[in-house]
């Protein structure tokens, strides 16, 4: 359905409305806002989006999104390199970093173990995690995965493997809703879960 008498605006609205949580009305407001900006502003925006899409890569060490071989977290001299937080996706890195309660490194799995879907440990970045732990002086691993069947399965598998390597393993304290994703948890709840993380003994 057309929202404007202009086909050019309708085309822009069609693309903008594909963003998560953006409906046709919000997309139209965005399009009209851009029309009121200078041509230079619009060009800068389009260039920023294109550069993001073509130049972003995965960190060689933790598989977070990065502008270069190593991401800003791995490159930071202020980070505690003896602790690594294991997350599903890069959105979780952002959520945990924003709490200000964690000062270690990360490891992004890029997925979760799901036998039903045919996804095993080797299909996500678990082998890379185990190699990294053996090569680096990692003393603690914080498993920060969603409270879902897949998340719990992945946590159990990783915890056993890491404990066998002599690594202290902890998980977020309860507070994130069962079935909930970390990126949608409020910062206070997530910060409390990190600060009060629980050691996994078995």
Regions found by a protein language model. Name each.
Residues 3-9, 18, 30-93:
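Cys/His-rich Zn2+-binding cysteine-cluster or related metal-binding knuckle/ribbon modules and their
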Residues 10-14, 28-32, 43, 47, ...:
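Solvent-exposed alpha-helical segments within well-ordered globular domains of core cellular machineries
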Residues 4, 37, 41, 117-121, ...:
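Catalytic cores of large soluble enzymes that bind and process phosphate-bearing ligands
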Residues 27, 76-144:
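Extended interfacial segments that mediate partner engagement and assembly in macromolecular machines
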């Amino acid at each position: 359905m057309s929202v404007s008498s202009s086909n050019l605006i309708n085309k822009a609205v069609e693309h903008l409305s594909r963003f998560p949580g953006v409906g046709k009305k919000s997309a139209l407001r965005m399009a009209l806002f851009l029309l009121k900006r200078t041509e230079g502003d619009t060009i800068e925006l389009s260039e920023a989006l294109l550069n993001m899409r073509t130049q972003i890569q995965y960190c060689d060490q933790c598989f977070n999104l990065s502008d270069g071989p190593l991401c800003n977290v791995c490159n930071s001299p202020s980070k505690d390199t003896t602790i690594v937080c294991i997350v599903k996706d890069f959105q979780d890195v952002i959520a945990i970093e924003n709490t200000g309660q964690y000062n270690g490194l990360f490891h992004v799995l890029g997925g979760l173990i799901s036998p039903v879907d045919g996804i095993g440990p080797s299909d996500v970045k678990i082998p890379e995690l185990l190699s990294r732990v053996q090569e680096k002086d990692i003393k603690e691993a914080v498993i920060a995965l969603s409270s879902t069947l897949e998340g719990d399965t992945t946590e159990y598998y990783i915890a056993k493997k890491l404990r066998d390597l002599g690594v202290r393993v902890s998980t977020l304290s309860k507070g994130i809703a069962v079935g909930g994703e970390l990126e949608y948890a409020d910062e206070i709840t997530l910060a409390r879960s990190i600060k009060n993380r629980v050691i996994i003994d078995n």
